[in-house]
């Protein structure tokens, strides 16, 4: 199956398909998590995680020597891409199979203007764009999750674990003793954790009276971090909270909700709707717009 040929006009409509073609899936398997894309994790509609990248990175990945080398192997099922025209064909193919979602990156003020949304320092907030534009700096996100190659192994281990628990009465005595020692060790660690939490709380209460600044033992113990980071640093002094000054009122930005549908003869692109971490597919038309560099 070859990639569709886009018309020569600036805007054109592409009908999407609910059934994904093997060629499109093979291309996405190559592109997904490709280092050339430099893809990052963002928040779609300030809720769901989505991997996104710029269109120019997609062009570079498809025109790279690595892609040409992988394409020569018939097992990979990749179609040849020689120039920007071929890149556009692949791009249209991915849009048709609902594997790409055009996105718009929001600024801090735009996120704050939406009721219920909160800016995230680590993950930028994104929303669906009206059109899929072939512009180098336009953002696109993946509507695809690469299948886990170890899923069968995990399933087998889970079944083996269930049978091992069921057959516990038939275990030899040395295995039963080993499980007992392990369980006692785990309970000891849990008891030590609670004891540490109680001791640090007592020290903190005493420091409120005895010292000018409150003292914390293991200040990151209950923070959202790794096990080792929870015990680093060993101690810290709590800094007093700064009083917030009066801020000037910023003009409110008008928020306009996006609608998927046709307007003045153009059909807007949103890709698949994502809600509560799930995606739904359906047949609809897509408007693609080329921008001359």
Swiss-Prot record:
<dbReference type="GO" id="GO:0031204">
    <property type="term" value="P:post-translational protein targeting to membrane, translocation"/>
</dbReference>
<comment type="function">
    <text>Required for preprotein translocation.</text>
</comment>
<dbReference type="GO" id="GO:0008320">
    <property type="term" value="F:protein transmembrane transporter activity"/>
</dbReference>
<protein>
    <recommendedName>
        <fullName>Translocation protein SEC62</fullName>
    </recommendedName>
</protein>
<keyword id="KW-1133">Transmembrane helix</keyword>
<keyword id="KW-0812">Transmembrane</keyword>
<dbReference type="GO" id="GO:0031207">
    <property type="term" value="C:Sec62/Sec63 complex"/>
</dbReference>
<dbReference type="InterPro" id="IPR004728">
    <property type="entry name" value="Sec62"/>
</dbReference>
<keyword id="KW-0813">Transport</keyword>
<feature type="transmembrane region" description="Helical">
    <location>
        <begin position="186"/>
        <end position="206"/>
    </location>
</feature>
<feature type="compositionally biased region" description="Polar residues">
    <location>
        <begin position="272"/>
        <end position="281"/>
    </location>
</feature>
<comment type="similarity">
    <text>Belongs to the SEC62 family.</text>
</comment>
<feature type="compositionally biased region" description="Basic and acidic residues">
    <location>
        <begin position="251"/>
        <end position="260"/>
    </location>
</feature>
<keyword id="KW-0256">Endoplasmic reticulum</keyword>
<dbReference type="Pfam" id="PF03839">
    <property type="entry name" value="Sec62"/>
</dbReference>
<dbReference type="InterPro" id="IPR011553">
    <property type="entry name" value="Sec62_asco"/>
</dbReference>
<feature type="region of interest" description="Disordered">
    <location>
        <begin position="240"/>
        <end position="293"/>
    </location>
</feature>
<feature type="transmembrane region" description="Helical">
    <location>
        <begin position="151"/>
        <end position="171"/>
    </location>
</feature>
<keyword id="KW-0811">Translocation</keyword>
<feature type="topological domain" description="Lumenal">
    <location>
        <begin position="172"/>
        <end position="185"/>
    </location>
</feature>
<feature type="topological domain" description="Cytoplasmic">
    <location>
        <begin position="207"/>
        <end position="293"/>
    </location>
</feature>
<comment type="subunit">
    <text>Part of a complex that contains SEC61, SEC62, SEC63, SEC66 and SEC72.</text>
</comment>
<dbReference type="GO" id="GO:0016020">
    <property type="term" value="C:membrane"/>
</dbReference>
<feature type="topological domain" description="Cytoplasmic">
    <location>
        <begin position="1"/>
        <end position="150"/>
    </location>
</feature>
<keyword id="KW-0472">Membrane</keyword>
<dbReference type="GO" id="GO:0071256">
    <property type="term" value="C:translocon complex"/>
</dbReference>
<dbReference type="GO" id="GO:0005783">
    <property type="term" value="C:endoplasmic reticulum"/>
</dbReference>
<dbReference type="GO" id="GO:0005886">
    <property type="term" value="C:plasma membrane"/>
</dbReference>
<keyword id="KW-0653">Protein transport</keyword>
